[in-house]
Amino acid sequence: MDSNTVSSFQVDCFLWHVRKQVVDQELGDAPFLDRLRRDQKSLRGRGSTLGLNIEAATHVGKQIVERILKEESDEALKMTMASAPASRYLTDMTIEELSRDWFMLMPKQKVEGPLCIRIDQAIMDKNIMLKANFSVIFDRLETLILLRAFTEEGAIVGEISPLPSLPGHTIEDVKNAIGVLIGGLEWNDNTVRVSKTLQRFAWGSSNENGRPPLTPKQKRKMARTARSKVRRDKMAD
């Protein structure tokens, strides 16, 4: 096992512990708490994969951080903070929408890279909006926290979330997963739109019809889906 992988996990465990103390003292806002919950799942997955105990890793991570801070001068710390790009946290969903439990009548789940896609295949002929909470850096989507599909009535009918066991994903991973989710929902004659905020920071533009540009692979897949559906309709007639 690579030593850097282990030390990175140990430091992440300790930093999570510090952030938990901030929340316990009621000093964290909603996005801070949201990231804390997501990172907890990620750390559990990484710990299981690496075969490391989180509590023991936290103690070692504390020692690593204390050693670095002891060696770090105040001036160097100021320069590091000034040069580091700052990310922003954007929210399409409210805390209630983000944390609400939901159930699927006809569940379908698919893993697309480091992301998990869940769709309720029982939903038909609905207008659906995709909303997401995510971080942005350099005006581009950095990390997806959670994406959910909502009907006009407010019901959750689909979701994209990072896999705790596979931390880290790219903007292309997110766009591909959104394409899969849209295709799955449109299979049942649902009309799907993507929030303008998500369009802007994932695709760099926003369309009035709420549809992001599709990749050539997604276009070919949707064309095959449409042809298959036409054949089924003809057979039914």
Swiss-Prot record:
Main localization (coarse): host cell
Short sequence motif named Nuclear export signal, residue ranges: 137-146
Annotated stretches, region: Disordered: 205-237
Keywords tagged on the record: Eukaryotic host gene expression shutoff by virus, Host cytoplasm, Host gene expression shutoff by virus, Host mRNA suppression by virus, Host nucleus, Host-virus interaction, Inhibition of host innate immune response by virus, Inhibition of host interferon signaling pathway by virus, Inhibition of host PKR by virus, Inhibition of host pre-mRNA processing by virus, Inhibition of host RIG-I by virus, Inhibition of host RLR pathway by virus, Interferon antiviral system evasion, RNA-binding, Ubl conjugation, Viral immunoevasion
InterPro entries: NS1 (IPR004208), NS1A (IPR000256), NS1A_effect_dom-like_sf (IPR038064), uS15_NS1_RNA-bd_sf (IPR009068)
Pfam families: Flu_NS1
The record's account of how the chain is modified after translation: Upon interferon induction, ISGylated via host HERC5; this results in the impairment of NS1 interaction with RNA targets due to its inability to form homodimers and to interact with host EIF2AK2/PKR.
One GO molecular-function entry: protein serine/threonine kinase inhibitor activity
Location of this chain's protein in the cell: Host nucleus; Host cytoplasm
A single Gene Ontology CC term: host cell nucleus
Domain notes: The dsRNA-binding region is required for suppression of RNA silencing.
Family the UniProt entry places it in: Belongs to the influenza A viruses NS1 family.
Free-text function comment from the UniProt entry: Inhibits post-transcriptional processing of cellular pre-mRNA, by binding and inhibiting two cellular proteins that are required for the 3'-end processing of cellular pre-mRNAs: the 30 kDa cleavage and polyadenylation specificity factor/CPSF4 and the poly(A)-binding protein 2/PABPN1. In turn, unprocessed 3' end pre-mRNAs accumulate in the host nucleus and are no longer exported to the cytoplasm. Cellular protein synthesis is thereby shut off very early after virus infection.
Protein name: Non-structural protein 1
Organism: Influenza A virus (strain A/Memphis/1/1971 H3N2)
Gene expressing this chain: NS
